[in-house]
Amino acid sequence: MWQSVFTFLQKIGKALMLPVSVLPVAGILLGIGSAHFGLIPDLASDIMAQSGGAIFGSLAIIFAIGVALGLTHNDGVSALAAVVGYVVLLATLGVMAKALGVESKNLMGILSIDTGVFGGIVIGGIAAALFNRYYRIELPSYLGFFAGKRFVPIITAFAAIGTGIVLSFLWPPIGAGIKAF
């Protein structure tokens, strides 16, 4: 049993390497841009700083894509499913935040509960699991267009709704605990 747990965690670790590999360039851009060196024009510094900040601000979706790709042998459909799932997750969390009276934040133009990178990793894992299970699914002929890989983003969207509802109850106390540190 421990061997299978270790193997699973090893797969997750490998999947996280792709999004982690983006962090150095984000740090370099942000650092050089924010330093406003005299040799670099102010406009170029501002562009670099904003570019690095944009990467750091998008880490959740970057991790969603990276985890999905890492757990599906780099199949692009899983990346699309992760993006669809992440956006649906944000929308669901936003609706639930309003219903529960929980603080929300503008993320990618959507008012939502901010789960940070955790939400991206979760939805990336869900997208990958659904891809690995359903990428060969056969549907009745009248739904044939949606069979196979085309089914994966659809089922991921519905899974993201359920995940968002569950996270809307679980994340606020967890997030508050993290903020307390």
Language-model segments: which ranges?
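Aromatic-rich transmembrane-lumenal/periplasmic boundary elements in polytopic membrane proteins
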Residues: G164, W171-F181
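Conserved, well-structured beta-alpha core segment at the onset of a catalytic domain
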Residues: S58, A160, S168
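Small-residue-rich segments of transmembrane alpha-helices in multi-pass membrane proteins
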Residues: K149-A159
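Alpha-helical transmembrane segments of multi-pass integral membrane proteins
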Residues: L23, A157-G164
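Early transmembrane hairpin of solute transport permeases
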Residues: V5-A147
